[in-house]
Amino acid sequence: MRTSQYLLATQKETPADAVVISHQLMLRAGMIRKLASGLYTWLPMGLRVMRKVEAVVREEMNAAGALEVLMPSIQPAELWQESGRWEQYGPELLRLKDRHDRDFCVGPTHEEVITDLARNELSSYKQLPLNMYQIQTKFRDEIRPRFGLMRGREFIMKDAYSFHADQASLQETYDRMHQAYSNIFTRLGLDFRPVQADTGSIGGSYSHEFHVLASSGEDDVIFSDSSDYAANIEKAEAIPRETVRPAPTEELRLVDTPNAKTIAELVENFGLAIEKTVKTLIVHGAEEGKLVALIVRGDHELNEIKAAKLEQVADPLVMASDTELRAAIGAGAGSLGPLNLPLECIIDRSVALMSDFGIGANIDDKHYFGVNWERDLPVPQVADLRNVVEGDPSPDGQGTLVIKRGIEVGHIFQLGTKYSEALKCQVLGENGKPVVLSMGCYGIGVSRVVAAAIEQSYDDKGIIWNDALAPFQIALVPLRYETDVVREATDKLYAELTAAGFEVLLDDRDKKTSPGIKFADMELIGIPHRIVVSDRGLADGNLEYKHRTESEAQALPLNEVLTFLQARIRR
């Protein structure tokens, strides 16, 4: 491809509304353009990258036995009403009416549609297992679209759905999809981690997320430094570093604490170590009108996902208001604690191993110091309530936990029978009786992968693409292309490289475009291999080669260029 025949839409300045680096560089490199909030047009340069992601996804999905389909992006409300999600989904679901006043939505996901397809096409266990996927445009009406493609409203997604007569078959396909996803992200050259995850609003019983590691990621990715254990922050089990509760060394005492409404103020004003404090959080109980106390150490954070799974606690988690606290306890949030508390208490594992600690006295501006379990109050129910922190023991007993930031690019679920029961998707089993199908769901954010790859690999000059993702593998930059000797050598090399199967962008812009601008554009776009053709180099029988990640260029004999590139470029 020649730049004279291409939409080379690079920009020198960074748009003011672009915050994250992938958004900035995709705009500056001429990959995308904003149409409206959360909506982007893919320009040729960006679309080449996305098509490469799609190609790898298709190859691995097909190799894993999945069948490609294409479902409508507009879905009838009746299917969502059958599943119960029409009312549940919230304002992110873009709803609309046709001219006949019938309700539809723009699909954020396709569980209902694929289940409807399966119930109409499948009748016997002999047709199972069946795994179908599509690469389709999705829409979620995010309240605050931001970060370009990282959190847009419209996005490209690969979503697959599998149907099974039993759990064993579902597990087999789930494992196959897990491996296919690992293959996809490995082939795309990404540093990623698959992690155990909560199933969230999709539902189901078992899931894994796939995260590209990047400092700009929105999610915490937890993994062991000595094993394959990995989980997201919601799912990671928090194991206390302590194994035995120390014996008491202090007496229980009631202390006036007028200037200690927070843990930080308690630590600063009274000299307590933060790990000797606790936070008492009052939440709504599962039983209407009931409140429950959840207690974590002062330096730990409550994990709301874990807390909401407790049978005594309302789901979703709702914190008690100040009015509710004063009516039930007689004190405000900064002065609460488990001693003489007229509510059911559940404490974190780390709290159960504390001694000589400080708690609120359930009287405004007063705390108890020197509190000890069993001596001053009984140990209540103990549960895993907190987020893990770096350095915690790995739950599998191997090593300690490391926390890095990640960008979620894939998610696989075992849905079970949630949707098939709601939509009555069943077949005749081997015994001739109806069997409700078990389902799996497997998604990859195709457009998000492009942005995540940039977040993982860039420098102050622009994007750094690997060979698998680059829009072009080679930037061919002639200096003084208007001269016969340079033009003839460049055109001959361009023909040889393209004939050999390389993707080449020939920068044939005229002499009004300086070599510096040409080099800067190719580095901004992130093309990994650059060949410079100059009359001076040709006089010596050489071309100049530079890799995007290298600081210095090297001379290559003209007759060795093709062999060199064939050995160097991953294809």
Swiss-Prot record:
Q: Which GO terms describe its biological process?
A: prolyl-tRNA aminoacylation
Report the domain remarks: Consists of three domains: the N-terminal catalytic domain, the editing domain and the C-terminal anticodon-binding domain.
* Stated name of the protein: Proline--tRNA ligase
Gene Ontology cellular component list: cytosol
Report the principal subcellular site: cytoplasm
Q: Which organism is it from?
A: Pseudomonas entomophila (strain L48)
Q: Which InterPro entries match?
A: aa-tRNA-synt_IIb, aa-tRNA-synth_II, aa-tRNA-synth_II/BPL/LPL, Anticodon-bd, Anticodon-bd_dom_sf, Pro-tRNA-ligase_IIa, Pro-tRNA-synth_IIa_bac-type, Pro-tRNA-Synthase_IIa_type1
**Family under the similarity heading:** Belongs to the class-II aminoacyl-tRNA synthetase family. ProS type 1 subfamily.
Location in or out of the cell: Cytoplasm
Q: Which reaction does it catalyse?
A: tRNA(Pro) + L-proline + ATP = L-prolyl-tRNA(Pro) + AMP + diphosphate
> What function does this protein fulfil?
Catalyzes the attachment of proline to tRNA(Pro) in a two-step reaction: proline is first activated by ATP to form Pro-AMP and then transferred to the acceptor end of tRNA(Pro). As ProRS can inadvertently accommodate and process non-cognate amino acids such as alanine and cysteine, to avoid such errors it has two additional distinct editing activities against alanine. One activity is designated as 'pretransfer' editing and involves the tRNA(Pro)-independent hydrolysis of activated Ala-AMP.
Keywords of this entry: Aminoacyl-tRNA synthetase, ATP-binding, Cytoplasm, Ligase, Nucleotide-binding, Protein biosynthesis
Q: Name one GO molecular function term.
A: aminoacyl-tRNA deacylase activity
Enzyme Commission designation: 6.1.1.15
